[in-house]
C-alpha cells in the first residue's frame, strides 16, 4: 500500500513538473545548494544480540560443522519448480528421486544428528527398562554386595572426578537452556515494540513526504529571490564583470598618463624655481660683487697711504697687498641662459589640466555599472514577471496534488494493520508464555537430575570413610549413593522425552538458520526469488510482473532491497518510470526557454569609451617638444658647484685682522679693522642668499634633468599604448558587453536549471525513501524470525541437547560410582590379615571367606540395617 501511495504521489507531482532525458545534475557557480530535510527513523538497521551474542555465534559454528554445505540455490529452485509432486505414471520419478537424494545429501549432517537422536529416543527407554528389570533381579549391580579390590580408591576417585566434570558440562548446557528460554520470552515481548517502531517509521515517512514537497516548492522561492537579487544588482554584477575585463587594459595606460600629468606639474614647478633662482642669483651676485669691490678699494686706499710706506708698517702692508686680488666673487650667473621660453611652454601645457582628463577616463569606466543599471530597468521587470508566473504555476501544482487524500488512505491502512497486530501480538505472547513454562520445566528436570548427581557427589565424597568396610559405610555416604541412583532413575525416565524436544527443535532451528537466516543475510534468498520464471512460469521477473503486470521489466528483489537499504527514493528503487516517466512530463527545456527568451531582451549599449581626447594628446605632445630635454643642464650644475667667493671671507678677515693688529696705532690700523668688520658683515648677510639660490637652482636642475631624460620617447610610448588601448575599446567593448551579458543570462538561467535538475533528482532518487520498507523486512526476518526466535531456539536445543547427551555417560558413571558410596549387605574379605582383621573363617571355593553361603551368621559380613 505504501508503494501504491508513493506511486500516486509521484504521478501527481510529475504531472505538473517537466524535463527530457536523465538529469545531468551539476553545480552552477553561485547557485544554491539544495538538500531535502533529513528524515530520522526510529528502527535500527542492525539487531544486536547483546551479551548472548557469543553464545549464538558458538551455535552458528556448531551448525556450520554439522551443515557445512553452501546454500543450495539450485536445489531450492528445483524444489520450487517441482512443487507439485505428482507421483503418477507420467511423473518424472527418477528426477524426483535424484532431487530427494540431493536434499538428503545437503541435509546429511542434520539427518545424521536427527537419526542419532532418534536412536537415543528409542534405545534409552529400552535400556532403562531392561536395566530396571536387571536390577530387580539383583543383576547389573543390583546385588548389594561389593568385592573389594586394590585399585578401588583410584577407580572411585576417577569415577567421581569424571562425573563432576560431566555434571559441570551439563550445568553449562542447562544454563544455556535457561538463558535461551529467558531470551525468547524477553525478545518476544520486544516484538510488539519493534513492530510499533516500524509502524512509526512508516508514519514518519507519510508525515515527511508533504514536508518534502513543501520544501521543494520553497526552494523555488529561494532560487527566485537569488535571481532577483542578481537582477536588482545587475549594475554591480554585470557592470562589475565588464569593468573587471576593461580595467586590466585601461588602468596601466591611464596610470602612465596620470604620472605624466604629475611630471608636467613638477616640471612647471622646477622651471619656475629655476627661473626665480637665476634672477635671485644674479641680483645677489651683483650686490656681493659691489660690496666686495668697495672693501677691496678701501683696503687698497689704506695700503697706499703714507703710513703703510714707512717702517715698520711697510712690511706688513706689503704682505697684505698680494691677497687683495682674491677678494671677489667667482660667480658668472649673468651668462647662464634663461629658461623662460621652456617655462612658458610648460605653463601652457599645464593649463590643459591633463590630470582631470585622466580622471574623466577613469570615471567613464567606473560609470559602466550605473549605465547598465539604468538601461535594463524595463527588461529586468519583464524577467521578474516571467519568474513570478513560474512560481505561481509551481504553487498551483503543489496545491493540486491530492496528497491529503492519499495520506488518509495509507494512514488508514497502517492504522488497521497496527490495530490487527495489537490484537494478535498478545496471543503470541500468550503462546510464548506456554513455551517459556515448558522450557522452564525441561530445564528444571535436567537441573533436578544434575542436582541429584551433585548431591550424590557431595555426600559421597564428604561422607566417605576409607577405614569403613562396605557394610559399615556411614549414613551420609550411603545417602550420596542413593542420590546418584535417584539421578540415574530420573535420567532414564525423562531423557528420551528431552531428546524428542531436542530433535524437533534442532531440525526446525537448524534449517531455519541455514535455509532462511544465513541466505537472507548474504542475499542468496533474494536471488532465489529473482530467478526468472521460477515463482510464475510465464513471468521472467516476478516483482515487476506483480507490481506493474509487466514481467519483462528488469526489477529484482535484491536490487530493490539494496536501493531501499541505501535510502533511495521509491521512484528509483521500484523503477516507477515504467508507470509514469518523469522525463516525459518534467520539461526543463521549456521552462528554460521561457526564461531565456526574456533574458535575450537584455541588451546593453555602452557608448564608445574615449580615454583621452585630442586636447590631452596635444598636451602630451607639446610637453614632449617643450625643449626641456635640450637644456644644457651641465652648465647650470657647473655654476652651482662654484663657491660664491674666490676666497673664504672669514679666513681672509681673520688674516687681515691679525696683520692689522701688528700695525702701530694709526689710521691704517683703524681702517683695516673696519674693513675686517665689513668683510664679516658681507659673509653674514650677503653670502647666505647667494648660497640658497645656488641650492635651489641645483635642485631644480636635477629635477628637470630626470624628467627630461628621454622625454620624447616616453611620451611616444604612452601615446602608442593609448592608441592600442583605444583601438581595443573601439573594436572589442561591444563584444565584451555582449559576452558578459550572455554569461549573466546563463547565470540567471543556471540557477533555475540547477533547481529543476535538483527537483528531478530529488523526486527520482531521494523523495519518499523506501528505507522503512527494507528496515521492516529486516525487522521481520533478521529481527523477529532469526534474532528473536531462531537464535534463542537454537541456543535452547544446543544447551538442552548437550546436557541430555551427557546424561548417558553420567548415568553409567553414576551407577558405577554409587557402589562405592552405598552401604552393602555383604562384602568380600581378603585372606591377608593385614587387609581384613578376621581370619578364622572357612575358606570358600574362590579363596574368600563367605560365611553366608553356609548359613552361619557372621557379623563382619552382614550389615545391621539395609537401605
UniProtKB/Swiss-Prot annotation:
Keywords of the record, alphabetical order, are: Acetylation, Cell membrane, Cell projection, Cilium, Endoplasmic reticulum, Glycoprotein, Membrane, Phosphoprotein, Signal, Transmembrane, Transmembrane helix
Task: Please report the organism this UniProt entry assigns to the protein.
Answer: Mus musculus (Mouse)
Put simply, this protein is called Prominin-1
Query: What is this protein's gene name?
Result: Prom1
- Which InterPro entries has this protein been placed in? Prominin (IPR008795)
The text of the family note is: Belongs to the prominin family.
One GO process term, biological-process aspect: camera-type eye photoreceptor cell differentiation
Subunit and partners: Interacts with CDHR1 and with actin filaments. Interacts with NAT8 and NAT8B.
Q: Name one GO cellular component term.
A: apical plasma membrane
